[in-house]
Structures are given as C-alpha cells and as structure tokens.
Amino acid sequence: VKIGIFGAGAVGGHLAVKLHRAGAKVSVIARGAHLSAIRANGLTVKSKEQTINVCLPATDRAEELGPQDCVIITLKANALPYAAAEIAKLVTPRTTLVTTSNGIPYWYFYGLDSPWRDHVVESVDPGGRLWELLPPRQVVGCIVFYAAEVIEPGIIEHTYSNRFSLGEPNGNKSARTESLSQLLSEAGLKAPVCANIRSELWLKLWGNLAFNPLSALTGLTVDRLTSRLDLRNTARAMMEEAALVAKALGISFSMSIDERIDLTGSVGAHKTSMLQDLERGRPMEIDALLGAVVELGRLTGKPMPQCEAMLALVRGRARQAGLYPD
C-alpha cells in the first residue's frame, strides 16, 4: 500500500514516522527548510518516552510520487483550497483520501440524511473546488486528538495523546476504514472506527470554536482561559449557541458544556493552534473553526450573536497582523 502524506508538519510528520517504522511504504510532501532538513537528516519525533528518526522519500512536487493508494491530508484547513490541485495529482478513482483538518470539513454534508444533503460549505470550500477535485465519496474522516509541534526543521515534539478517530461520512463500516484502523494501530496509534464521525468532529470542535479565538485575542493558554470565570462564561455562551446548531444537524453531545470546558483545561499550559499560528505569523483556521459554524447557524436558522461577535473580533485581529484578507 502506497501512502502519501500531504503536509509533514506536527501531525503529518508524526504519522509518517510511525507508519514508516511499522513497515508501511510512506512518502511525504513538505516544503522549505522542513523539507531540506528531512532530506538531509531524516524526520525525527521526540516524546518523553523516546526519540525516533527515520529516512523516507520527501518532496515538494506531488507528480514525483505519482498515484497513491491512500493520501492522508494533514494541512491546515485554510491551506487546503490552495493545495487541492497539487493533492489531486496523487489521486485516482481508487485512492482513499483521509482528511485530518480541524473544524467543519468540506465534505460535511456529503450523503447526509438532512435537508442540506450535499450542501457546499462556502466558508471552507469556496465555489466547491475541494468537492470537485477531492471527491467526498473517496473520503474517510479522521478526527485528531493529539498535541505536538515542529520545534525546528525536521524535528517534531509530541506532547499529548495519539488518538486518530476514523469514520465514513455515511456512517457505514467499510473495508477501507477497518484496514486503515489496523494500519494505524499496528503503528502504535489509537485509531477507533466511529459509527458517527460527525459526532466525534463536533465534540472536538465544540471546545475549539470558543477557546481558539479566545486564546488568539488574549494570548492565554487553555488552563488560564478555563479557570478565569469571565472567559469561561464567554466560552460557555458560544458553546451554548453551537450546541443548538449541532442539535439542528442531528448531533447530541455525550458530555455537558462544563465537562467539555474542563476537558480543555486539563491539557494544561497549552497554546491553542490558533495562538501558535498568530505568534508565528501564519494564517489561522478562523473560518473552519468558527466561520463555518456561523455559516451553519444561518443555514439552520439558529441565531449566534456571541459567535458572530467573536468571529468579527478574531478576524479583525488577524487582519491587523496581515493574516486575513480584507
């Protein structure tokens, strides 16, 4: 099985190292100094338990790799529309596409038994370009519960969790999800197959849609955001609005809002991905984590004043930093 990992950052690089070490035929698409370091010294993952270094094929040109049996897309959601044509060079009608981006994915409404079946979410897929180039029928959803960062080119530090939940958008069990789960499990990762991947998606997003923008605006880590009553209440109000949208889409949560907030706080002095991106001068996943949720609120007729206000503020902060279009 030929596996191409598009985006060898913290998540993609970790997957590449683990899968390669387990005997899979893995190649990575990377760029810049990170790519140069991988070519020169291999790819390294450090954790409290061990340090692993592997040498594997790496390029910034997808056509050098050719068609893959499985493509794991580990780009940020905001980068995906710009990379879609390059990713498509790895894809045949038989290729399995695994998406790992945070937030609402472009394929969210594919085959969904709802009035909005096959609706294109413009916030993450302007004009339906992703839907066209990366067909949702070939997608396996993957929700990542994992914390790591690239601490220097070619070196990733893994700090928290290693869970990669998998699921077909239509909820069916399939040979491809089962084989992918087995492959990841053999690589030492937790890879449960979920009957409803959207529920898993919303459980992660429920916290992210509030605490990512809050962290970008305040500069605070999640332990401080969840322990300050005023900020906790702000997050709770946003999450209450989002829960009504989720309910309208057939999603119910397995925990209360406060339990979800406490789960976020339990990670400790962790900077959200949005805050990390802001500090490094990189575009943030504003539209996937919050803009798309507000879009779904309008679609389902659920008012979201708190979320809309937060969206305006964090977009303003991003524009001030030159990281969001006017």
What are these regions (language model features)?
Residues 1-50:
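NAD(P)+-binding Rossmann beta1-loop-alpha1 motif at the extreme N-terminus of oxidoreductases
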Residues 2, 25, 190, 252, ...:
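Residue-level detector of anion-binding/catalytic polar loops
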Residues 28-31, 166, 294:
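Short internal beta-strands
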Residues 37, 90, 125, 129-204, ...:
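Internal alpha-helical scaffold of NAD(P)-dependent oxidoreductase catalytic cores
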Residues 52-55, 60-151:
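Rossmann-like NAD(P)(H) cofactor-binding subdomain of soluble oxidoreductases
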Residues 224, 232-326:
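NAD(P)-dependent Rossmann-like dehydrogenase/reductase catalytic/cofactor-binding core
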